[in-house]
Amino acid sequence: MELKNIAILGPGGNVGTAIITELLKDGPRFTITGITRSTSTYKPPPTITHRTVDYTSFSSLQAAFQNQDAVVNCITGGATHYEPSKLIIDAAVAAGVKLFFADEFVGEITREAFRRLPEAFVGGKCRIREYLEGLGREGKMAWTSLNGGPFFDMYMPNRHARIYGSGNQPLHWTPLPTMGLAAGNMLRNLDPIRNRPVLLDPITPSSTVTQNTLLRTLEKALDTTFTVSHVDVSKIHRNALVVLEKWKECGEQGEGKAQMGKAMRGLGVCNQFYEGDDEGHAEDSERTVQNELVGVEIMQLEDAVRDALERYGENCQVVQGMYNVEACEL
């Protein structure tokens, strides 16, 4: 089955932009439509169509999806929750869309470390995966999804590194352009990825990519030395679980919402760096990685770091705020 007409939901975000950039390399092979809310300030490249939609309206969504072969969901915010996401999917089915590319783009969502995160914070990714699996089994619409590790993380303006735990926990870092390349190849060749998720781990050897090796590679690339502070990630983990229980007691409004925010900052860190349980995402990833399936070549850590520095600049501050968590905050 060949896909020609591709609708990108959330085309102006990091992932949407990376996918569009990759698809545009094929010239006229793909007809791309970027779909946004009417309030969006998105300015599309000259070669793609821009269409606005009401994400709360089934008829508006269905009309936008008419004649589209694939819908690639890259939206963020409230529309990632279960009911809004299901509405988008149902509209795609009604419009005759062949492939739905799910809005995952995280780590392995079947891991318990991810599934325990409150849906109010991370969206309905797990339940949406199950819903799409059902549609695939019934032959109503094919689906796929793409996941990797964090796109990039180091705070370089002041040459300071925060190391969580020992710093030796394997990281499954996926450069953003690699996500774009993989998604593009998935749309170029549907059959191998129909009705299945794809997990990337493109840096080799993956078992040696850690905070410490990343730091040493950065220091070598920049010909400098970082100051280092160590963070007790086990304390963050313990406190985050306590706060999560408080959130469950308080609900999603008022104090409960504040408690959830604290817990999520801690659990987000622990999902990457905590070493104190049996959830071992390194082993999980080794079993499910599908780099070759989607045309992703293995790259050396040194090359990945150099490419990231060229792309973001030597003084970038990339997602640092996500990981800047102290146990006392919880």
Per-region residue spans from a language model:
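NAD(P)H-binding glycine-rich loop region in Rossmannoid oxidoreductase-like domains
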Residues: G34, T39-A95, A102, E108-F114
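Terminal hydrophobic/aromatic helix or amphipathic segment near a protein terminus
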Residues: L215-E279
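Amphipathic terminal alpha-helices
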Residues: E286-L330
